[in-house]
C-alpha cells in the first residue's frame, strides 16, 4: 500500500517514471503496430529516433530498387528498423537480412529482434563493425541517439574494442548475389568501399549514406565509379541541417547486373 500512496505525490511519481525510463525501458514493452501484422518494439528510450527517421519521416522512401529482394545486408542496423520496414513493405517475401551493428547498446535489442518468431531464421545479427579486415579489432565510440562511430568527438570519450567484420562472415551467412546493401555507419562507408570489394561486386544495389569526414563528395563518387557502380538516386539528407552539405543518401546500382 506504500507504493500507491507515494505515486500520488507528483514529484516522487516523476522521479519514479524518469528512473524506469532510463534504466528499465525495455520492460515497459512499448510496441507500435505496422503494416501487414508487424510490430516495432521500442527497446530503449532513444529507439524513437531511428523509428521516426524510417517509419515517419520515410528516410528511405524512393531509394528501394524495383527488383525482387531476398538477401539484404544491413550495415549500421541500430535497432533493426530498416530491415523491419523493408519486410513490412514486402509481405510476400521472406527477406534474409544480415544486421551488422557494433554498438553494445544495441546488442540486447538486435538479439531479441532476431529471436522473434516473425524474423527467426531470417534475420541474423553480427555484433561487429566495418573496418580494415586485417585488423581483428578497432576502437569504437558507443553513444546513444544513433551517434556511435569509430570517430572521437569529445576529449573525454572512452573507446571500446569491437571485432571487425570480414567478407567471409557475409559469404558464410548467405552465398551471393546480394540484392540490396544498406549502409549508414557514420563515416565508415569509406572503409566499406576500400575493403569490401568482393561483397560489393556481388551486390546488385546499395543505399549508402555518405558523410564528409575530411573527404569530398566528388572523391566518394569517383570511388563508386571505379567500383563499376552508378548513382541512380541521390538526395541531401533532410534529417541533417539543410545548410550543411555534409551528408547525402545515395542509391547506387552495380553495372555488372
Model-derived features: positions:
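Phosphate/nucleotide-binding beta-alpha loop and adjacent structural elements of enzyme active sites
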Residues: 1-257
